[in-house]
Structure formats: C-alpha cells, structure tokens
C-alpha cells in the first residue's frame, strides 16, 4: 500500500507537469500525509511483531529476521514518497505549473517515470514473495536506465538556469526513487537467500 501510494503521488506530480495542472500536484501533496500514516502504522506493526513471536507468526513470519529488512524497505518507500512530494512542489512553484521543455522531452520524462514505477513495484514484490529472480531483475533493469538522467539533460537545448534546475531536480528525484528500489531489491535478495531455495541450502 505504501508503494502504491508513492507511485500514485509520482504519477500525479509528473502528469501535473506534463499538463500544467496544479490540481494534480496538490492532490499528490495531499497524499503525503496518507503515506506518512501508513509508514507509522507499518513501524508499529514491525516493532510489535519483533517483540511478540506469536504476532509475527500470525502475519506469516516464522522468525524476526525479515522484520529488520521490512523496516528498511518501509523507510525507503517513505523516502520515495518524499521524492514524489518534491516533484509536486516543483509543479506548483514553476511558471505555468510545467517544465520549459518540448513535448518529446516531456514524453521521455514520463517514460522514465513509468520505468521507475515498475522498479519500485517489482522490488516490493520481490521482498514480499522472497523472490530471488525478481530481485535480480530489478538490479538488471536499473542498470539499463542508470544513465537516463544524463541522457535527457545532455539533449536539452540552451535554456534559462532556473528552468534547467527544475528539470534536473525532477529527474534527480526520479533517479533517487530508482536507487531506493535497488536497495529494496538487495534486501529482498537477502530475504530470499535466508530461505531454503534452489539458490541455498540451510543446514
């Protein structure tokens, strides 16, 4: 739920920039409170489960080891919601609530957003399912978009410094979100390897 809230915020913020629609940016900002609330509830559940083995078993955990990883994942997801909030604030503060780029560049930014969304969703799925292969796929896909920010910036025409900074801040926020997804995938890898699977044998 925290991942999907962050993803929705990201989509609304970037769509706001694409269409010059401040209402969408405001909607994204309003969701930040919901994201924080989910994060706090998750921390409470994790903390309580860690100290109560019966509760941990009730939510499908045989031991407390995954809870440490889940706490880190929750924090990373909360930070991705902060990234989306940053993009929404740029949309509200920028002139005409949009970026000073052509439609082709805006499409590249939206495509990049879609790729980032896919990474964050896959990373959480890998952690929940303890799926080693999905976790590895996240890292492989990330390597394929690792230079996307620089590629888009390099292709921009000469522009006002303020406009350039806004574009750069949006792209960096998306890049950071992708990096958090990779961190979550690394945690998912550890969770998967902690279980008996085709990759490991636990004595």
Q: What are the residue ranges of the model-derived segments?
A:
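Cytosolic, long alpha-helical scaffolding segments
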Residues: 1-203
